[in-house]
């Protein structure tokens, strides 16, 4: 299968970007740019088992040496499907620690129980994979979903929400047939009850917008891994103020 990495990152003169797969930091896939901001590069990957998450991360290189790397605690991930000869287009943001990284610890997010196999895989020749980062759902007995414009996303009807699958702790994904989606696509992430599947909360974010033109047969586009926040998960601090007199 072919992998294409896309990321925006402003580099200094003499710096380049590279991507490394599965922790293999000694063999980076070097990217190229025309403006020093938008970077892209491709590579072939063989013998990737279907449904098993593949991790990767980006680094900044100067004179062949890596001088900065993304946070290693939460690499980018995706799950290849059973179909061969696919072209995965991985659209990314630079990934440092999440804004509220403490929420991603097991103390706040609970223990992740990995499934025997990942169900979320490319269902068609042209597919879109939605990716999101969202902690704290286990403690509230919830799972992530996506709802939006068009029949495939329920036409904003929360009863028709598309449920997502957790493929790593706090990392959620779902893959849909691109032909069933209407572009430009507006959507939002929602928190659903893990038992009833009913929507309990909409994310605290404006409608998200996805614009894609002219996908080719065999292409699978993966959105950047967006951080999803819900009002109910906002930080709550309690304490006592003690006056000090001099």
What function would you assign to each model-found segment?
Residues 2, 10-53, 61-81, 136-182, ...:
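Aromatic-rich carbohydrate-binding modules that target alpha-glucans
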Residues 62-112, 192-238:
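Structured interaction patches on ligand/partner-binding surfaces of diverse proteins
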């Amino acid at each position: 299968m072919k992998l294409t990495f896309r990321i925006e990152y402003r580099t200094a003169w003499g710096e380049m970007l590279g991507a490394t797969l599965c922790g293999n930091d000694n063999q980076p896939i070097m990217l190229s740019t025309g403006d020093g901001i938008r970077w892209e590069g491709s590579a072939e990957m063989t013998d990737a088992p279907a449904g098993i998450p593949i991790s990767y991360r980006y680094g900044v290189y100067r004179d062949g040496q890596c001088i900065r790397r993304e946070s290693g605690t939460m690499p980018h991930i995706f799950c290849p499907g059973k179909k061969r000869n696919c072209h995965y287009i991985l659209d990314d943001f630079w990934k440092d620690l999440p804004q509220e990284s403490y929420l991603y610890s097991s103390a706040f997010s609970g223990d992740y129980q990995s499934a025997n196999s990942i169900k979320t895989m490319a269902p068609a020749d042209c597919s879109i994979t939605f990716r999101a980062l969202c902690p704290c759902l286990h403690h509230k007995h919830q799972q992530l979903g996506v709802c939006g414009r068009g029949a495939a996303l329920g036409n904003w009807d929360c009863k028709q929400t598309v449920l997502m699958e957790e493929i790593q702790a706090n990392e959620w994904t779902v893959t849909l047939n691109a032909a069933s989606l209407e572009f430009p696509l507006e959507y939002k992430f929602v928190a659903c009850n893990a038992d009833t599947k009913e929507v309990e909360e909409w994310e605290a974010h404006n409608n998200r917008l996805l614009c894609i033109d002219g996908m080719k047969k065999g292409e699978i586009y993966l959105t950047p891994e967006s951080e999803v926040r819900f009002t109910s998960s906002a930080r709550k601090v309690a304490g006592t103020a003690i006056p000090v007199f001099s």
